[in-house]
């Protein structure tokens, strides 16, 4: 952000919220590829290699204006020849510029809102694992969850209208309309299952910004309703720096939505309602009765259709009882289980037994979906039998071993919060034997002969990685390490879901 402020201070257009001229500043595209900036935005750095030259950008924008999009039919939308042979490369260049520039006013506004406010900015809240301690604390006391699939697709104009309320540069928005045409005809919806996958992979940063801007409208309603119904006003939410920049937003939402919601229905006034969004879905957990949860369900459908003009269907919202249903959440299976215990109590000469059955959130590794991910990645077959990785047979022995160990270590790291860690032994076994078969195939040998040659140390390296990592953090006592390894450990440095754990 300091880079942005240094570049933008001498620019006169900053005073008038003009973003369009920034598209012709080459340092914008250099910043998009910078190591530090991309690490902050959680995207993989691909290096700045002068492909984003100012001349290329000017030519692309000129051709966008000269192209007649009214002549494109629905059948020709997939054969858009505007970008020619290097369509993916050039569209990525433009989308990176769009994404970097449109984030500037939001980031500057956010930083200015924190000035003078004594707020601790916690970057640890970026971790995926930071949500699980919250769920462990809250879900056992609730009864029902509403699994909501956020409605798709959405028309292009709705995205533009969402940005128009916050971005004042008409030229920038006009060019953005032209750019979005290459992904979908203006007369159809923007996102189908196939097109959203292509768009998000080729333009991840731009897609995330458009997606979050769109979803933020829904979450604004939840924030407003929650603030109105809760006795404890949401005034300390500014610590969620990377999530929604909620601080100093509450008063604005109260003014905006007060006219739309002059009377809050009684069934919405629930101080025990909790909301979590992930991977195009969201969870509403509550202590309400099934009748009130059904009212919530149809209220959400009407809200989307009437207030946001997005088509939805009640079938996209499922109400489940926590005690009978498992949540497929961030690659984990989570369910609320009873943990019965019997305590003998004695008062004077009388003794009696007290049966206690507190609820506990049980978080386990989904073995079958995880094996399916390994099979899709060609580490094993559909039955879970390890196979050799052909694409890595041309690497050196050290590189092959190091890559398999890194995959195994990352999975162990990601699933460290599981209450049943022994289930990970099967996954480690598949990766270990796949590594052995890959090396044996490279050396034109059998897996048994190769294992006999390298010895048992090779086997143990896959299974002791997590324990060795914990020994670097805590005192090296066998009791402490054994207790930590068997218990749940949530790490605050996991900022994206593991590729093999993503079963979507």
From Swiss-Prot:
GO BP terms: mRNA processing; RNA splicing; tRNA processing
Any GO molecular function: RNA binding
Localisation per UniProt entry: Plastid, Chloroplast
Q: Is the Metal-binding keyword given for this protein?
A: no
First-listed, main subcellular location of the protein, grouped into a coarse class = plastid
Where is it found, in Gene Ontology cellular component terms?
Answer: chloroplast
Does the keyword Chloroplast belong to this entry?
yes
Instruction: Tell me the keywords, alphabetical order.
Output: Chloroplast, mRNA processing, Plastid, RNA-binding, tRNA processing
To which protein family does this belong?
Answer: Belongs to the intron maturase 2 family. MatK subfamily.
Cited HAMAP family = MatK (MF_01390)
Q: What's the protein called, per UniProt?
A: Maturase K
Lineage of origin: Eukaryota, Viridiplantae, Streptophyta, Embryophyta, Tracheophyta
């Amino acid at each position: 952000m300091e880079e942005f402020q240094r570049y933008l201070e001498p620019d006169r257009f900053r005073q008038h919220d003009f973003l369009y001229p920034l598209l012709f500043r080459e340092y914008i595209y250099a910043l998009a590829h910078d190591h530090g900036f991309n690490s902050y935005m959680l995207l993989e750095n691909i290096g700045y290699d002068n492909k984003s030259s100012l001349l290329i950008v000017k030519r692309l924008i000129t051709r966008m204006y000269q192209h007649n999009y009214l002549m494109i039919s629905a059948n020709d939308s997939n054969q858009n020849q505007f970008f020619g042979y290097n369509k993916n490369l050039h569209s990525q260049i433009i989308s990176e510029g769009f994404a970097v520039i449109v984030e500037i006013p939001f980031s500057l506004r956010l930083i200015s809102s924190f000035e003078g406010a004594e707020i601790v900015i916690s970057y640890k809240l970026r971790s995926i694992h930071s949500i699980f301690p919250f769920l462990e604390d809250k879900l056992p006391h609730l009864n029902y969850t509403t699994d909501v699939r956020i409605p798709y697709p959405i028309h292009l104009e709705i995205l533009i209208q969402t940005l128009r309320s916050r971005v004042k540069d008409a030229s920038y928005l006009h060019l953005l309309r032209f750019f979005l045409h290459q992904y979908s005809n203006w007369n159809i919806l923007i996102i189908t299952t196939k097109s959203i996958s292509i768009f998000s992979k080729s333009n991840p940063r731009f897609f995330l910004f458009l997606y979050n801007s769109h979803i933020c409208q829904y979450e604004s309603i939840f924030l407003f309703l929650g603030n109105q119904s809760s006795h404890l006003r949401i005034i300390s939410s500014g610590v969620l720096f990377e999530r929604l920049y909620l601080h100093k937003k509450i008063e604005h939402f109260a003014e905006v939505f007060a006219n739309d919601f002059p009377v809050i229905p009684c069934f919405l006034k629930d101080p025990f309602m909790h909301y979590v969004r992930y991977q195009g879905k969201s969870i509403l957990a509550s202590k309400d009765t099934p009748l009130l949860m059904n009212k919530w369900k149809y209220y959400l459908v009407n809200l989307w259709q009437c207030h946001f003009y997005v088509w939805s269907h009640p079938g996209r919202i499922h109400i489940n009882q926590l005690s009978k249903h498992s949540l497929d959440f961030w690659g984990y299976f989570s369910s609320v289980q009873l943990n019965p215990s019997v305590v003998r109590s004695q008062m004077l000469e009388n003794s009696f037994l007290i049966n206690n059955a507190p609820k506990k959130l049980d978080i386990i590794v989904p073995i079958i979906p995880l094996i399916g991910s390994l099979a899709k990645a060609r580490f094993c077959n559909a039955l879970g039998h390890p196979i050799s990785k052909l694409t890595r047979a041309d690497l050196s022995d050290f590189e092959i071993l190091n890559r398999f160990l890194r995959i195994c270590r990352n999975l162990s790291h990601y699933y460290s919060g599981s209450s049943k860690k022994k289930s990970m032994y099967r996954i480690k076994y598949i990766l270990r034997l796949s590594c052995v078969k890959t090396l044996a195939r490279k050396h034109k040998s059998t897996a048994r002969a190769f294992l006999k040659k390298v010895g048992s140390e090779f086997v143990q390296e896959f299974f002791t990685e997590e324990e060795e990592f914990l020994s670097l953090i805590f005192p090296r006592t066998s009791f402490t390490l054994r207790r930590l390894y068997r218990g749940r450990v949530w790490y605050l440095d996991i900022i994206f879901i593991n590729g093999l754990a993503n079963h979507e």
